[in-house]
Swiss-Prot record:
This is Morphogenetic regulator of filamentous growth protein 1. Interacts with FLO8 and MSS11, both morphogenetic transcription factors binding directly to the FLO11 promoter. Pfam families: LIM_bind (PF01803). It comes from the Eukaryota. The gene is MFG1. Residues 417-445 have a biased composition (Polar residues).
Amino acid sequence: MYQGPPQPPPQAVPMPYIVNNNTPPYPNGNINFPPTAQQNIPPTVYPQQVPFPGQPQGGQFPQPSSEQQVFNQLPQVTQTFHNSAQNTNATGGPGSGSMPMFTPVASFPHPMATAATAAAPLPRSASQASLSMLRVPYHVRKYLSNLAMLKLYEIINEVNTAMGKIGLLSFWTELISDIFTPDAVIRYSKKSMTDYREFEFIIPVFPVICSTLGRFGIVRMEVKVLQLKTQVLSNSTIFFNCPRVTFVYYYPDGSYITHFSQMKGAFDLDLKINWLDVSMHSFVPDIEWNAVERLLSDDTKSTEIEQIFRKLKQEDVKEQGNSFAENNATNVPPNFEAITQLRSYFDVFRNVSVFGTQEGLMRVMQISTVMSTLKNLRKFQIEKNIDSPVTALSAYIDADKKDSGSEPLHAKRRRNSGISPRTTTLGPNGNSNTSNEELPTSDVNDINKDMTKKKMKF
């Protein structure tokens, strides 16, 4: 604390005698001060000091004014903290209360409070999660997107190195529980030249589908992604998109099939997938050269292979009538029967549908979609505490009929089309009606039957 300007000593203290070069030396070498030294030496003169407001005069120590007393007070420790965006600890996370914030008295407002009040107000429509992600700096959001990309590559590596575990249900159950959230939804669509299929699965049935691949002869899977992009959205999710992804399924005889697809989905902040959408648009079956060599070197099949090659070398095969082409009126190669017979020796061509998947696996996926749709029925049975599944189904249908009159049309269609609340299956020419118009029960039943036929169609 400042004590004011220095003051001269009192008059009772004698001042020393200043000896200069003109002072004659003393014979005994001692300096004796004359008795009149105090009278001959003038007192020390100090410069005039400008007093502070409220400083008393008269050579006493000045007293601080009321403003200085407020300024000199120690800061007070308060337990009130600002929001998580302003009060952060050393690790960058929101403070938990272990680091107190020192706030001066009311005469000197805190600069953080002034900056917070001067900031522009945020829109009311934004949610709390959106506001928190909007405040996150760009380098933090970029860091989270890179983490999601590394997580996706880690998942792909787990699938690619799962040789010998494709048919194990325990392996897929553990892997999928680590990848997806419990309420995640997986959509898988297939497109051919003449048809389009769409499936939706919930997490409990998805391991069954993956383990079914091993029971149909697949020994190894390989996933390749190109042009992978990730981005942190304002709703605290990390979106990823891969327009070029290939799924390769290998069979033990050396044949394989490649599915060309597009994939997109979203991670949460725990780096678990909330939803996944895979769309397959084409496929190409292929055979490795060593598989052809094994077939040609097999003595038990040499006679059959020679007959197939003899059919392929016939010169007049184009002139002969093809029963398959005549009955189906389709453009097929003239040696289609020989090619079909040669394909039968490889697993990749056995019972393959026009979607590039075996018919048995297509049925399993269809049943899994139906079971996923029955999730709402299972919830209804648990809520109503009904033991019999048949009784629960009847009560669920009756409750659906009662609620169908007051439910909007677009809500009926969404509820009847699938389980995912994030998607709708109205089709490309569908027009969702957002008005609250009511339909009779017969119209609702017709809509339900039409949608059920579309979902159950093979």
